[in-house]
């Protein structure tokens, strides 16, 4: 059984292009792309416009330029996971934290060729794009314990082993020694 992980970051400008495979990538096997699945509620641009409108209506001012109302989670999955698994996970994350999944993608076509064996080494993962705001367009403020709980929920919903909790000051050397 694989270990679970989800890494959350502000969404990037090229997120939809990457997730929807609108650009050719050298680490993607096009012959496996038919195994990818997607779930799209709306475009990132439309959701941002809606958030900005709600924020302006509730606060009487524009949203700060540095605000990150849309965030993306990249999570490890196994070959058998489907978009329905991600929808179920998204529903649970919304119940627990109020974050709403606006897009989800399974990527089963990425990986690399082993230099030693010539064998394809897949990198099964998923991208989930979240509206990280409340009904007034204000960013949700999830703390470290919330993010730790999110890791546990990912493991539970996907039937994976919960990854080890790491401290803020974990170093790559520590990880390398554990191998």
Residue ranges: model-predicted function:
Residues 1-179:
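N-terminal nicking endonuclease/strand-transfer module with a His-rich metal-binding environment
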